[in-house]
Amino acid sequence: MLPKKIDYIKIALIVVGIIALFLPWLTISASTINIKTDEGIHLSVNLAPFRVSSDIKSDTNNIFVEMMMPYVKQYFDMAVKEKMSTFMMIFGIIPIILYIASIFVDKKAVVVGAGIAGITCASIFVVLFTVGLNSSDSGLALTGGKEVTPIDLITGVVNEKSSYLSKDIIKIQVGTGWYLTMIIGLALIAYPFIRKV
């Protein structure tokens, strides 16, 4: 009995699909947002799958600012993590869900679905966050270009003024990334059924 012919194209597609599946994870892990305010406060956000870490420090000699830094960090962490943690999980989980769901339908849908979902998520996430959060010359893009002083941060006003992050960007990304990925994924999963009809 002759050995079964190896389908190298199928193997190559599976490999490409697996790589594409993890593309958002790799890209997000390499993303860091650095912002500096006019008061000399450095804000840094490190993005990783299922996790958002932030750091804040000051290069000013202002004693008041130095004393208030722990409180500034507290509110900065709240503003960033509360807005982004759920969003990060969505973008990490969607490709995996599509991948697993496709396995039970069609092997080609696995590869194509994972690849497109992965590339879509990674592209939208990186472009919008990198361009959006670094678009302000004053370094205040995190707060929509609005002036935010240490006192504003301390009193939690940053949660109100950070509309650029909490509303615009998140809305655009969740809207575009979520629906586009789901539509493509569902179409790919449904394709084998439509093809057989």
UniProtKB/Swiss-Prot annotation:
Q: Which residues form a coiled coil?
A: none
Lipid biosynthesis in keyword set: no
Query: What transmembrane ranges does the database entry give?
Result: 11-31, 85-105, 109-129, 174-194
Q: Which domain of life is it from?
A: Archaea
Where in the cell does this protein reside?
Cell membrane
State the GO CC annotations. plasma membrane
* Topology relative to the membrane: Multi-pass membrane protein
Q: Which UniProt keywords apply?
A: Cell membrane, Membrane, Transmembrane, Transmembrane helix
Name the cystine pairs. none
Q: What name is this protein filed under?
A: Uncharacterized protein MJ0979
**Which organism does this record belong to?**
Methanocaldococcus jannaschii (strain ATCC 43067 / DSM 2661 / JAL-1 / JCM 10045 / NBRC 100440)
